[in-house]
Amino acid sequence: MLNFSDRLIESIKKKNSVLIAGIDTSIENIPDYFIKRFYDKEKSEIDNLKTILFEYIRRIIDAVEENVVGVKFQAAFFEQYSYHGFEVLHKLCEYTKNKKLVVIFDGKRNDISSSAKGYSNAYLGETPVFGKKMRFFEFDAITTNPYLGQDGIKPFVEDCERFKKGLFVLVKTSNPSSADFQDLMVEDKYLFEVVAEKVYEWGKNCIGKEGYSDVGAVVGATQPEAAKRIREILPNSFFLVPGIGVQGGKIEDLKYFVDSNNMGIIVNSSRDIIYAYKNYVHSDFEKSSYLASKNIKESINAAIS
């Protein structure tokens, strides 16, 4: 199997796109007409929830698949529905994988030692069960929080190497309060630069044939100045870039995120795609999501070409 970074590049070239569709879906934001279409009074509220959530997201994925290289599932929007949400997530992960799209679990997981290994087993690797190894999810990559240091990252990196998976470590995030910690000075460097240096170290042993590491960084689209500094530290790492659109990130600033080959980024768009029907005059949410993803893809390509 190819390394994660090589598979990602292969998909980028095939689709002529670096766009990732972010799935941050809550049941209350699904159109009423769609809920009425699938709501069955003979079923429980939980069964209706699972059916409607799956059917809506499945149709979003179908609508945008030609314009995106992958799908990023935000864990919180499934965890809010307890294990019922994770049943839906499991089905959607398999569904998306069958479409040959890159599948990212955005859970920002982290812990130490065996706890971190448990997270990595679940989402990247294998879990021991009665003397056998079982896979419960088939994600291609996961987001992680580096706050606990190497102890919390090592199990994920080891599974990236073993199973050809990917890792995106939070380095400089798009939220307004990211500066509270990430912009603190450590001697003569910002803390986010120190973290970027660690990301480089963690990823130097899992380099694909195309020369990119399977360990990348999350760098928010609202942080172009920081992105320049991080790119100097991580010349051969992919940046997962959230925050365009609603969060205030500008597509034209993406030129500061790419590497010297105008590569090295995948750009997430969530609400502008999954709730695009709110911005179009017609009520066809599938067509709206398709048009939104097409427009965003083309705008990104123009900005980084």
Curated annotation (Swiss-Prot):
Record flagged with keyword Repeat: no
Catalysed reactions, semicolon-separated: orotidine 5'-phosphate + H(+) = UMP + CO2
EC number: 4.1.1.23
Source taxon at top rank: Bacteria
Family annotation (SMART domains): OMPdecase
Gene3D superfamilies from the UniProt entry: Aldolase class I (3.20.20.70)
UniProt-listed GO biological process terms: 'de novo' pyrimidine nucleobase biosynthetic process; 'de novo' UMP biosynthetic process
Pathway stated in the Swiss-Prot or TrEMBL entry: Pyrimidine metabolism; UMP biosynthesis via de novo pathway; UMP from orotate: step 2/2
Keyword Lyase tagged: yes
Any one Gene Ontology molecular-function term assigned to this protein's record: orotidine-5'-phosphate decarboxylase activity
Protein name per UniProt: Orotidine 5'-phosphate decarboxylase
Species this chain originates from: Caldicellulosiruptor bescii (strain ATCC BAA-1888 / DSM 6725 / KCTC 15123 / Z-1320) (Anaerocellum thermophilum)
Gene name per UniProt: pyrF
